[in-house]
Amino acid sequence: MADNVFKSHDIGLRAQKKILSRMATKNIAKTFIDGTTASLLDNLYRLCKMHTGNKAKAEKLIKNIIKIVIKIGVLHRNNQFSDEELQKAELFKRKFQNTQLSIISFYEVDFTFDLPYLQKSIAESQVALKSIVQPHLTEKSLGRIDEVFDFFGEEALLETAFRPDSPYREVMGKIVADINAAMETGDI
């Protein structure tokens, strides 16, 4: 019987997630996101576009990142996560930071790139994130998470991005600088 009770808070939360996800363009996101994070998203867009050769696919990936971040932010701001989910969030944060540190190291130190290690790190971050948000997001949103992590864990992208003579070397340098700056300020 309790499932049929009208809950305006739940409807309000769903409306917030829906409205914000529809507004998730790079320009709108810049009003919610600091300069370093915006720069990181712009550089990730450039990397995606270079790798795929497809502007629409690159835009979709970045929009998916923005939508995911906004929805998680709405859930967090509205205290929707249980204590257990908050503990899982700390685990995700550690795993994601390890992934970021690996990216920095593999870029800065030639011939240290370890594809299986990085793919495992990305996959573990994906699983950790989904374990937190699964009860709160739709299958479509969970699919967005998979699409983003699957793209950035793709062998061809990673192998090309971390080659010392990579055609992505310049944009990877900017991404690494953005990650370093964001980690220093605690933005990611």
Curated annotation (Swiss-Prot):
GO terms for cellular component: cell projection; cytoplasm; cytoskeleton. Its main location: cytoplasm. One of its GO terms (biological process) is regulation of microtubule cytoskeleton organization. InterPro entries: TNFAIP8-like, TNFAIP8_sf. Disruption phenotype: Viable and develops to adulthood. However, pupal salivary glands are abnormal with large empty vacuole-like structures, tubulin disorganization, and reduced autophagy flux. Salivary glands appear normal up to the wandering larval stage, but then exhibit a slight increase in overall length until in pupae 23 hours after puparium formation, salivary glands are significantly longer and wider. Salivary gland histolysis occurs but appears to be delayed. The keyword GTP-binding does not apply. Keywords: Cytoplasm, Cytoskeleton. It is found in: Cytoplasm; Cytoplasm, Cytoskeleton. Pfam families: DUF758. Important for modulating JNK signaling, cytoskeletal remodeling and autophagy in larval salivary glands. During salivary gland development, involved in the positive regulation of the JNK signaling pathway, acting downstream of the TNF ligand egr and upstream of bsk. The name 'sigmar' is an abbreviation for salivary glands marred which describes the mutant phenotype. Belongs to the TNFAIP8 family. Interacts with the Ste20-like MAP kinase msn. This is Protein salivary glands marred. It comes from Drosophila melanogaster (Fruit fly). The lineage of its organism: Eukaryota, Metazoa, Ecdysozoa, Arthropoda, Hexapoda.
